[in-house]
C-alpha cells in the first residue's frame, strides 16, 4: 500500500483487519464474501481510505456480532465476551 495516501479511517481499518486476521482467520476475499460484499469494496475499508458503510457494518454485526460502537468508535463494551476479551488481550 502507498503510505502517502491519506488514511482517515485507519482506526476502523485496524479493528476490521484484527477481526478478519486474528479471529476468523480469512483472507479479504473470503471475509468480504461472508458478509455479502466484493473484495474491492472491503479492501478500501480495511485500507482506511474509505469509511465502512452502514450496510457493511450491519452485515458484520449480523454475521459476527461486532457492535457498531466497536467498529466505528472502538468501544468494546457491547462485544460478545469472547471477542471483547480477545480485543483487550491483543498484543
Where is each model-derived feature located?
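Residues in the helix-turn-helix
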Residues: 41, 51, 70
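Short alpha-helical DNA-recognition segment
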Residues: 23-47
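Short, basic-rich loop-to-helix N-cap that marks the start of a DNA-contacting helix
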Residues: 47-62, 78
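Short, charged recognition helix plus adjacent turn
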Residues: 1-6, 62, 69-91
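A short, Lys/Arg-rich alpha-helix, primarily the initiator
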Residues: 1-23
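Alpha-helix N-cap/N′ positions at the starts of helices
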Residues: 11-12, 37, 52
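The alpha-helix within a helix-turn-helix
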Residues: 20, 32, 61
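Residues within the helices of the helix-turn-helix
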Residues: 17-18, 29, 58
Amino acid at each position: 500500500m502507498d503510505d502517502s495516501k491519506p488514511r482517515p479511517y485507519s482506526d476502523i481499518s485496524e479493528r476490521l483487519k484484527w477481526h478478519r486476521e486474528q479471529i476468523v482467520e480469512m483472507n479479504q476475499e473470503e471475509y468480504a464474501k461472508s458478509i455479502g460484499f466484493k473484495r474491492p469494496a472491503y479492501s478500501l475499508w480495511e485500507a482506511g481510505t474509505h469509511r465502512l458503510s452502514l450496510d457493511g457494518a450491519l452485515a458484520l454485526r449480523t454475521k459476527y456480532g461486532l457492535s457498531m460502537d466497536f467498529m466505528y468508535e472502538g468501544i468494546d463494551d457491547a462485544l460478545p465476551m469472547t471477542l471483547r476479551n480477545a480485543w483487550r488481550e491483543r498484543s
